[in-house]
Regions:
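Non-catalytic membrane-proximal stalk/linker segments that position and tether the catalytic domains
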Residues: 1-33, 39, 63-70
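Acceptor-binding helix/loop patch of EC 2.4 sugar-transfer enzymes
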Residues: 26, 118-119, 123-150, 175, ...
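Conserved catalytic-core segment of nucleotide-activated headgroup transferases in glycan assembly
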Residues: 28, 32-41, 52, 161, ...
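Short N-terminal targeting/anchoring amphipathic segment
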Residues: 88-107, 122
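Acidic donor-binding loop of glycosyltransferase active sites
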Residues: 94-96, 164, 280-294, 305-308
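Short glycine/proline-enriched, acidic/aromatic patches that form the donor-sugar handling elements
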Residues: 254-256, 275-276, 292-296, 314-320
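Short hydrophobic beta-strand element within catalytic cores of glycosyltransferases
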Residues: 298-302, 308-312
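Conserved acidic donor-binding segment of nucleotide-sugar-dependent glycosyltransferases
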Residues: 325-333
Length: 337
């Protein structure tokens, strides 16, 4: 990636990269937003002239100002909402790279960007949406969801066909993309970047409880919480009646908040500092994901924190050599054990 900062443009001009996402990354709410923020930090730190275009054109504080402090121009507000195509017409020839990572925003802006720029288009696949939806359809035995998956596959294939470079976090999805698009440049890249390593207290005899981390607005997370509480936790309580599950994640709907009890704490949104306290005191992170795609940020974060994990196969999918760190369990009895 370092060649991006030197191989475009000419003379002393910094190469310009336009980063397009559906909204300003709120990194303490969603794993995907944390990934986007880390990549924006990386790209700006490489010396690129980075411009950020949120598809909703909203300025969200403090996150927008934090991007500005990194030297990133944010193309937000009423003027850009009404005039983004004119801005592309006027400035497109100075854009060297365009970075997409969501199918909806790529679909909305890609044609205009192709018409107004000569930029190389990089698409970073957070996960294959069609694969996640197809797995959901299988779990729920719902043909309507499979129809939605088929629509997303057409959308994503069109985007991939019109991109110059494809990035993915998952080895599994890299293989799928290489098979479907053998002439494309496809690379697996890290989900998160960390500047240092934590030094947690390794005396797990002092720790207690279970921890689940994940935005409750994400349907696979809601399904995972419900399945764990309904099918797995009662089996755990037969052996460890005092076990408590802490659920961290913003935007919990009524179906999740209704699970709150002495044994299930629906904590909701927390700050990074509060989350660190939970990681430092928990005995085990659970990842009971039954359907999904891509690499799971909750798994990478737990590994970084040095906390043991119990996960399903889907939860561990796509991570290099993960079998040396955790053995997947897909049935309730095995997961509880």
């Amino acid at each position: 990636m370092s060649k991006w900062a030197t191989h475009a443009g000419g003379g002393d001009r910094k190469p310009t990269l336009l980063f397009v996402d559906y909204e300003v990354p709120q990194y303490d709410l969603y794993a995907g937003s944390r990934t986007n923020f880390m990549y924006l930090q990386l790209l700006a730190g490489m010396g690129l002239n980075v411009k950020f275009l949120p598809a909703d054109f909203l300025r969200v504080e403090p996150y927008s100002s934090e991007l500005n402090e990194l030297g990133i121009e944010t193309l937000d507000g009423p003027w850009f909402k009404e005039n983004w195509e004119q801005w592309l017409t006027d400035n497109g020839q100075g854009i060297d790279y365009v970075f997409f990572n969501k199918p909806e925003s790529a679909t909305e802006f890609m044609t205009a960007i192709r018409n107004c720029t000569r930029a190389a288009i990089i698409y970073q696949c957070h996960d294959l949406h069609y694969l996640r939806l197809s797995r959901k359809a299988q779990v729920e035995n719902d043909p309507a969801i499979q129809e939605e998956a088929d629509r997303y596959e057409q959308m994503e294939d069109h985007i991939f066909s019109n991109s110059d470079v494809l990035l993915t976090f998952s080895q599994v999805e890299e293989k799928i993309l290489r098979e479907k698009f053998p002439n494309k440049k496809v690379f697996t890249v890290p989900l998160f970047f960390y500047q240092d390593l934590p030094h947690p207290d390794r005396d797990f005899s002092k720790r207690k409880g279970l921890l689940f981390v994940g935005a409750c607005s994400h349907k696979p997370n809601r399904d995972a919480i419900a399945w764990f509480c309904d099918e797995v936790l009662p089996l755990v309580h037969r052996q460890i009646p005092e076990a408590v599950l802490n659920v961290v994640g913003a935007h919990a709907p009524a179906e999740i908040t209704a699970l709150d009890s002495d044994r299930v704490r629906i904590i909701g949104r927390v700050s990074d500092g509060e989350l660190q306290v939970l990681y430092d005191s928990t005995k085990l992170v659970v990842v009971p994901t039954r359907y999904g795609a891509g690499v799971k940020g909750k798994v990478i974060e737990a590994l970084y924190q040095g906390v043991p994990i119990v996960s399903t196969t889907i939860g561990l999918e796509g991570i290099v050599d993960v079998e040396s760190l955790a053995t997947p369990k897909d049935e309730a009895a095995g997961f509880a054990e």
